[in-house]
Amino acid sequence: MRLERALRARQLIPLAAIWLLVGCGKQETVESTAVPPEVGVYTVKAQALTLTTDLPGRTSAYRVSEVRPQASGILQKRMFVEGAEVKQGEQLYQIDPRTYEALLARAEASLLTAQNLARRYERLLDTNAISQQQYDDAMATWKQAQAEAQMARINMQYTKVLAPITGRIGRSAVTEGALVTNGQAQELATVTQLDPIYVDVNQPITRLLGLKRALESGRLQRVGDNQAQVSLTLDDGTPYPLKGVLKFSEVSVAPSTGSVTLRAEFPNPDHKLLPGMFVHALLNEGEQQAAILVPHQAVGRDARGVPTVWVVKPDNTVESREVQTLQTVGNAWLLGAGINDGERVITEGVQLARSGITVKPVAAKNVKLMSEFGSQVQAQAH
């Protein structure tokens, strides 16, 4: 009985082996005939890229002059319309001139007396009728009288309060009949020059130092005369039609904010910009000749937090690659390293990607970088 069971077991072993081999062959056939997953890819194109930075700022007047009297007296008349444009040298107020007219008349009379005495002494000196000292005293008195008469004329002119600069004048702080004094603390009015107008913006010093390093290393090139041009957007999103020019930057860093103040000058013929307005200034930073841009959705992060992308190699196999993200540019990342021109990165079906698998790459849908539309891109610090 035992012998019969042993013979049967020997007969079943080859059959089981054959069955296992057939089953494995079927599994290999199924695996070999599996369809590769379809993924959307974006083909990277190196391109010239002009980088700009968006900085908040405020407008400030080109010139501001507070009008104060240089003569004392009763204000007789205001001679301008509040809020109107005034020209330099235009009369704004009239101070009662009668006191100064009398002082001028007395000074001119004293001048005439001193002049006649000096001329008379000059003739007497020729005949030795007076001493040289008497003649010198008479000449000094004449010159002093000339100076006093000139001062009286100046004070007389000061009764007419003139506009110190051309610009728009604000409200009058005094009315007719008010007593004003020479050099008083309160201004009579303020004249503001609005054309051109300044825009002051603050740039973080870390960003400024990074740009300098990029320019020194050659990663960024200056864009010629356009680097000094500044574009402006109003607080409501309306673009300002005229370009400005970057004038200077402060030589010191604000300790509280760690930023440097930059000043730009804008033409303002229609007075659309008023002092104190909040605006956004777009400054040219530089140009990168062969910039590598990839869509935001192509970049992920691994468990260590390192930026990575899935790259489809020429044989359609997938590879995970670490990249260096420099900054965002519109709807894309500007890369410093990791991806080369012409390589394909996965933007759709990223969840299907695994290292080493074969995929079916197709052109990704609805993936367009802002720079490909020809619009000027905007850079933000990363």
UniProtKB/Swiss-Prot annotation:
GO molecular function: transmembrane transporter activity
Signal peptide feature range: 1-23
Membrane topology (UniProt): Lipid-anchor
Chief localization: membrane
Lipidated residue numbers (S-diacylglycerol cysteine): 24
Subcellular location: Cell inner membrane
Family stated for the protein in its record: Belongs to the membrane fusion protein (MFP) (TC 8.A.1) family.
Designated name of the protein: Toluene efflux pump periplasmic linker protein TtgD
Source organism of the structure: Pseudomonas putida (strain DOT-T1E)
